[in-house]
Amino acid sequence: MPGRVARVTEVIAGSPNNFQEAIKLAFDRANQTLRNITGMKIVDMSVMCEAGQIQEYRVRAEVIFVLE
């Protein structure tokens, strides 16, 4: 029975609107380059603030994909 080997790579993305958009941007960008993505784990969520206002929503994610 053959097994599978996966790899994990980290991506960071930001959005001025919300975390959901930042997550989608991270996934969409990873999906342009990586094949066989099987999952994505959000490792960290943070915001960048300036003058008492949120300027950017940021996510750090691990993208899991199966090696060919």
What are these regions (language model features)?
Residues 2-5, 9-11, 46, 52-55:
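Amphipathic alpha-helical hairpins
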Residues 3-39:
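Short, well-ordered alpha-helical segments
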Residues 35-49:
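Charge-dense, low-complexity polyampholytic segments
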Residues 45-68:
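A cross-kingdom feature marking charged/low-complexity
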